C-alpha cells in the first residue's frame, strides 16, 4: 500500500525521493494494522446485508467467481464473514495459471458463463451473485489490447447471460465493484 511509502521509516520497496513532512495522515479505512494512521471510516460489523437478508427470506443464492474475485462474492459480500448463509451455494472456478493475465484475457469468464447458463435454464437459484474478474484484472496490467479483448469477452458473456435470463423469466442487475 502507498501508505507504507509515506509512513514507514524503513520502507525500501522503491526509491521515495524527497519525503514531505506530514502534519497528519488519515486513511479511508484500516488496510493493515501496522500502518500508524488515523482511520476515517473504521471497520464496522455488517448486519442484515443482502446475503443475510436473502437467507432470512429462505431464498436460494449462488455465489460464483473465479479465484481472483471469489472473496468478493463470498467473504466481502457477506460483510467480512467467511461462513456461508443458509441456502447459499458457492462455486469457485479456478483462474488460469499464467504469469500475467494479458496472456489469457478471457481468464475463466467462459467457464463461469457456461455454469451460469445451465443454472439459469434449470431455474436453480432465486438470486445469482457473480463477479467477472477480467475487466479489473486486465485493466491493472496496463495492456490496452488485452484489456479490450477482456471487455469484448465479457460483452459476449453478458449477452448470452441476459438472453438466457430473458428467455427463462429472470432479471438482472449489472454493476461494477469499482
Regions found by a protein language model. Give the residues of each.
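Glycine-rich, histidine-containing beta strand-loop boundary motifs that form or position
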Residues: 65, 132, 174-176
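Active-site-proximal loop/turn and secondary-structure-junction residues that shape catalytic pockets
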Residues: 81, 134-136, 176-178
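Metal-dependent active-site segment of extracytoplasmic phospho-/sulfohydrolases and closely related
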Residues: 149-178
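His/Asp/Glu-rich, glycine-adjacent segments
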Residues: 1-124, 140
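Loop/turn elements at helix/coil->beta-strand transitions in domains of secreted/extracellular proteins
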Residues: 123-126, 168-170
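A residue-level signal for conserved active-site and pocket-lining positions in enzyme catalytic cores
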Residues: 75, 130, 177
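Active-site His/acidic residue clusters
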Residues: 124-157
Amino acid at each position: 500500500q502507498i501508505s507504507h511509502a509515506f509512513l514507514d521509516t524503513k520502507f525500501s520497496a522503491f526509491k521515495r525521493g524527497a519525503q514531505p513532512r506530514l502534519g497528519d495522515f488519515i486513511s479511508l479505512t484500516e488496510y493493515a494494522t501496522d500502518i500508524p494512521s488515523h482511520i476515517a471510516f473504521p471497520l464496522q460489523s455488517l448486519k442484515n446485508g443482502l446475503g443475510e437478508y436473502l437467507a432470512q427470506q429462505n431464498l436460494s443464492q449462488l455465489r460464483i467467481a473465479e479465484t481472483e474475485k471469489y472473496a468478493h462474492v463470498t467473504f466481502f459480500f457477506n460483510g467480512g464473514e467467511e461462513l456461508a448463509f443458509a441456502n447459499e451455494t458457492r462455486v469457485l472456478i479456478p483462474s488460469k495459471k499464467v504469469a500475467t493475465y494479458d496472456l489469457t484475457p478471457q481468464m475463466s469468464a467462459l467457464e463461469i458463463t457456461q455454469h451460469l447458463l445451465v443454472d439459469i435454464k434449470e431455474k436453480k437459484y432465486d438470486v445469482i451473485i457473480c463477479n467477472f474478474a477480467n475487466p479489473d484484472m486486465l485493466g491493472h496490467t496496463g495492456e490496452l489490447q488485452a484489456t479490450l479483448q477482456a471487455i469484448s469477452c465479457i460483452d459476449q458473456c453478458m449477452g448470452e447471460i441476459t438472453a438466457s435470463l430473458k428467455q427463462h423469466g429472470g432479471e438482472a442487475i449489472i454493476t461494477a465493484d469499482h
